[in-house]
């Protein structure tokens, strides 16, 4: 494939995302979809923009806790590779690991996929798009936290009614991860992370997991409150509240969210 001709991993990743984005936009054109409507490219309340950036940090303790749990069962396949890429070229890594994934992955999963699977039931749509988002990361360790992030981004796009919100949160989350990796790689703290990544789980790691529970819970509560605030600022809170009323859910159409051919294509 392309990797046979392109040996630089960052260049390959960047080109891959550009091709993927082009293919996605061509798909929407072939289907006759209005790109702006399908992808929900709408302006967001300026105040909520800062809350979205804050959300990208409050979900980090939760994602970190999920990663620690996943490391007990699955080998971390990305930490070492990411560190090497960051140390070689931080700015290029931010482009190919933060900006492009935030742009392209959100276009696909919170844009195309979610627009198809939310038709009958937005809650199921969020879970399904998050499931596909997790699977797309191609390993069990990343699937665990990616599934969680997919749920957060799904609620976020509904709270703001704009894909720009999930793109922003995705980019900030990935970008801050790269910066954190860069800083940790210059300290002894990274050695502990490397041992965990290689599968050397000890009682100390279990203690770390237990100790991280309070921060994860605080991060989860703050994240929920931020999504509520974002929904309020964008005039979406009343609509989202109806999701949790049984009588309203009973009125949702009993139809398939998407056809078999769509799921097969995904």
State what each model feature region is:
Residues 34-64, 210-211, 244-266:
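Interfacial transmembrane-helix boundary/kink motif in multi-pass membrane proteins
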Residues 211-227, 262-266:
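Alpha-helical transmembrane segments of multi-pass integral membrane proteins
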């Amino acid at each position: 494939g392309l990797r046979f001709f392109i040996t630089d991993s960052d260049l390959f990743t960047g080109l891959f995302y550009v091709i993927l984005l082009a293919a996605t936009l061509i798909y929407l054109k072939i289907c006759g979809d209005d790109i702006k409507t399908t992808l929900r490219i709408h302006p967001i309340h300026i105040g909520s923009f800062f809350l979205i950036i804050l959300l990208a940090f409050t979900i980090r303790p939760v994602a970190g806790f999920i990663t620690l749990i996943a490391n007990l069962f699955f080998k971390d396949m990305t930490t070492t590779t990411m560190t090497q890429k960051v140390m070689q070229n931080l700015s290029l890594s931010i482009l190919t690991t933060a900006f492009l994934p935030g742009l392209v992955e959100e276009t696909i999963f919170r844009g195309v996929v979610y627009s198809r699977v939310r038709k009958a039931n937005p809650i199921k749509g969020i879970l399904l798009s998050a499931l596909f988002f997790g699977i797309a990361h191609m390993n069990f360790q990343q699937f665990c936290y990616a599934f969680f992030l997919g749920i957060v981004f799904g609620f976020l796009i509904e709270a703001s009614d704009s894909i720009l919100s999930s793109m922003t949160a995705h980019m900030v989350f990935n970008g801050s991860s790269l910066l954190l990796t860069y800083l940790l790689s210059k300290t002894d703290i990274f050695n502990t992370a490397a041992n965990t990544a290689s599968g050397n789980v000890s009682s100390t790691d279990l203690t770390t997991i237990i100790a991280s529970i309070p921060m994860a819970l605080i991060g989860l509560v703050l994240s929920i409150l931020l999504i509520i605030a974002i929904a309020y600022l964008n005039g979406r809170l009343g609509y989202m509240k109806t999701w949790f009323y049984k009588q309203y859910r009973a009125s949702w159409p009993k139809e398939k969210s998407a056809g078999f051919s769509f799921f097969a294509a995904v």
